[in-house]
Amino acid sequence: METGQKILVAIDDSENAIRAVEHVAKFFTPSNKITLFSVLQDTVTMFNMNHPELTPYFMAQQTYFGELEEKQKSIVEEAQKKAKKILLDAGFKEENITLKSQHKQKGIARDIIEAASGYNIIVMGRRGLSGIQEFLLGSVSDKVLHSAKDISVLIVN
């Protein structure tokens, strides 16, 4: 691969994401600039906690959902640290590796595409959804692959 590229690696805590990082470590030169990018789910939105028909009991449980959000953030941070170590062990310099995360704004796929503005390539793992789940829900990697314009997308299986 050409050196000096800006590579956005979309990661979460899945094995597929780690395989994508391992692929970058193996096939891209350490002179490339790597951004390990994660999109965090907004727990309030994820569990539809703004719905007006929530029972008072469920409303009282919002603290628990806040704890879930902190746990999710911690899991993503650990995944990013693991990914960074893989790159460092492969010879990438610390100053060429950036860790970045944000809360979901427009949708995970759209957020990844927007974050990739100014990058040469998006690298991500393929999700392990079953055939019916992928048909009904679609996968983030599929959405990125088919929606990204003016940027290469590499899906690692």
Over which residues does each language-model region extend?
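Active-site phosphate/pyrophosphate- and oxyanion-stabilizing loops and adjacent acidic/basic residues
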Residues: 22, 110, 142-143
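Gly/Ser-rich helix-loop-strand patches that form or flank binding pockets
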Residues: 114-157
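Low-complexity, serine/threonine/proline-enriched polar segments
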Residues: 70-75, 79
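Amphipathic coiled-coil/heptad-repeat helices and related helical stalk/stem segments
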Residues: 17-20, 108-109, 137
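Small/aliphatic-rich secondary-structure junction motif
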Residues: 2-66
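General small-molecule cofactor/ligand-binding pocket signal
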Residues: 35-37, 98-102, 154
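Structural beta-alpha unit
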Residues: 81, 85-121
